[in-house]
Amino acid sequence: MVALITNLLEQKGKNAPIVIGGCALSYYSREVYFTADIDLAYADREALDAVLKDIGFKKQGKYWVNEGLKMAIEVPSSVLIGEDSPVEIVELAEDLQCKIIGIEDLIIDRLNACKYWKSEIDCEMAELLIRRYTREIDWLYLEKKAVITENNILSELLELKRKAEQ
């Protein structure tokens, strides 16, 4: 669905939305984690709203819902953490792709939830991602981001890195 939305936005000369949150976690965890909705980061809400309406979604509170598809989309953020935030481009078919938040920023998101909200599932998911992607992670970028978040999660990050390297 996100690839279709991306395609329609790009046809209008707009940028692609970025998959974040639980849907991104489901992708990187290879479906160890499941979510009921799709979270997107996108700045041009007007353009996105128009595309969602065109393909049968209706606004219900903070969600865009398509009853026929049994699908909900939320746009909780207009941007990623920063301009230098990496994204993963997933090619689904020729001229059909979607962008997903980079693994590093997803780990930051999960560690923040782990520390701030005391969310055990987010602690577990951060550890799973670090173990699974330890060789692919840009550790310099990740450690820099861990220090500048409001929760300063560097010590938690380094502990998970140490465990993953054992």
PLM features: what roles do these ranges have?
Residues M1-Q166:
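Compositionally biased terminal segments of proteins
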